[in-house]
Structures are given as structure tokens and as C-alpha cells.
């Protein structure tokens, strides 16, 4: 099980359209009374709505299936069936929605009240009024409702924080958060004390405020899933400014500069765009005996190995214990936030404008295969949609479906594959004989 409650896989099913109706008026001089069957109602959509009051995806652990209502059937007197209400599913602010099958990002839900249709309801089937023609003024034909879209979704929740605290385990991130905000993270002198992100609000002495996330501790190899790994890195993608906290006392026996390089290497390995974010170096534990000398060496190494054309990151010596240097650090952070834009999580070209619910234009209208029992099997989105909307209880509807298959080239394709008169052909669970 994931160490964070920030991912969930769910099933969504939009409502089917209501079936159209076959009905006739009873009027003198009107053939068979004339058609009077109405259309079915639209199936309900499944709609995600951002609720700023939600903080986790915990609810989706216990309720993984969401199904909207179907539209009502068409009625006599040409009346349409009632359309179904949309199913509203509330999600936390900061939820990214992916198609679980393709991994494609469908939407990034960041604004309170933002809505997105994740599954589109099927349209209602047409009643027999719609099929009346001069040649057939009293058609005994109607359509079934279109099936609602069904899909499996992967939800990811990323912490919505302006500033992210990163660094090796036990460098003092949780303590720093506790003294600059009202947050009360778990603090301990052992690695991975923080295994879920802690959030807090900072208010500077000048009245500016911003959100800070103390993110779970990172170790080398995190971008390959080591330790808390990619679960940690997923949470930092949204932050606009990174505070890189380093233990200048070297109390764990590590070189502060090597720590700095290792963390940045992991950030770059996971996603190059993470390194586009401005970074402030927080030299923590400056109240310890060796910290001042270690900071001097750190600055020398940083200057010696930094690109001569690049601007050196700001370094702020602080002590979370004595609160030394905190006010200066927070003012600089607020100033940097003011001039740093938000970073798009994904390229806009990767985002869908709305939920995909039609057919891929490049996909073939149908495919033909053959089972071990020699039955020809027809498949394909377009063909299966036509099949599902055909009312096989009505002879006219069956004949119309046969004409549609011929129009799509199914008969010719079966002949080309070697189908002979009397061979069985299957669509879904429905079988019929091929007539040459």
C-alpha cells in the first residue's frame, strides 16, 4: 500500500441514454395511427468538482465505484424521457486526473469550484417519430440509448504549497516548519520521521503570507523509487520556491556540500523542470560548534564548482532551535515568491480540454478476427456502439442494422477474409449467420 494517501484508482460509469419508444396515435385516416414514440433522455455525466475543504484522497479508498443514473425511456405522445442528473464527485484541491489505461493526463484540478466531466452520459435513443419518411410513414423502429462512457481513472493529489522544504532526513525540516508556522509535525532524531507532507502557513512581519510544505525526507536513489522515493518527489512538483535545508553541523557524519549535490541530482533525475524553480539554501543548525567552519567550506566549494555565468543561490544561516536568522529568511522567501510564476505541471499539449468520449478518428470502424470454433468475431468502438443502440426486438431495426453493416463495408471485408454463406458471425454475445 502507498505510504501516502495521495493516489487512488477508481471506476467511473456515466449513465446510459434512455431507450427511444415505438408508439402510434389512434386517429382516423392516419396509417397505423401515425408514429408517436418519443426519444429517451440523456444519461447523467460523472463530474469532478474541486472542494477546498478536502485534504486527502482517503474517501476514495472506501468508495472506488461511481455510477451516474441513466436517462428515462421515451414516452408516448412524442414525449421525451427525462434526462438524468449528473453525478457530482468532490475531490481535493490539487488533484491530477489520469486515464489509468493510457496514463494520459485528463485534467489538473487546482481552483476551488472547478468542474470537469470525467465520463460523458450517453444520448437518448430516438423514438419512432424520428424515423418516419414518405415511404414509411409508420415505422416500427426505435433506438436504444447510447451507453454512457466508462473508464478507470488514476487520481494523484499533490500538496498545494508555495514553498517546499527539501533535504536529507533529520536535517531539521520539521523543526523549522514548527517554529515558522502553527503546524505541529512529528519530530524525532531518526530518519523518515516525516512520512507524509505537513503543511503550514507563514506570515512575515510585513504581513505577507504563504504556504510551506515540510516534505518527506529524501535519500539518494529516490528518483528510482528508493526510500520514500517518487512518492516524495510527486509532492514537490507544485511548489514555486524550494528551501533546501542542509545540516551545517554535519551531525550525521555527512559532508553538507555532498548532501546539497545529492539532493539536486535526485530532483533533476525525477523531472528536469524541478530544477527550474528558484532555490534558497537554508544553512541550519548554526548553533552547533562546527557549523560556522562547515558553512565557510560549503560556500568555497559552491563558488568553485558553480557555473561562472550563473547566479549563486542565496544562502541563509539559521538555527531553528534559537530562531536565529528566521525573519530574514522568511522575508527573502516572500520576496522571491512575488516574482516567481506558477509552474505548469504538464505541457499544455499533454492536457485534454475535456473528457474524451467519442471514437478515435484514426481507429478502424471495425476489426475482424476468428475464434477457435471458426466463428467470425466483429469488434470496434463504432460498430459496438451501433450494435448497442439497435433494438433487436424490432424487425425494422434489425434490417437497418444490417444495412449499416453493409454501408461500413463489413460484408465485403468478411468475404475478403474467406467467410462463406452460413458461417457464424459474432458481435459481443449476439450471433447470426453470414448470408452471401
Curated annotation (Swiss-Prot):
Domain of life per record: Bacteria
InterPro entries from the UniProt entry: G_OBG (IPR031167), GTP-bd (IPR006073), GTP-bd_Obg/CgtA (IPR014100), GTP-bd_prot_GTP1/OBG_C_sf (IPR036346), GTP1-OBG_CS (IPR006074), GTP1_OBG_dom (IPR006169), GTP1_OBG_dom_sf (IPR036726), OBG_GTPase (IPR045086)
Principal subcellular localisation of the protein: cytoplasm
Magnesium listed as a keyword: yes
Matches recorded under PANTHER family: DEVELOPMENTALLY REGULATED GTP-BINDING PROTEIN-RELATED, MITOCHONDRIAL RIBOSOME-ASSOCIATED GTPASE 2
Family per similarity comment: Belongs to the TRAFAC class OBG-HflX-like GTPase superfamily. OBG GTPase family.
Record-given protein name: GTPase Obg
Organism: Streptococcus sanguinis (strain SK36)
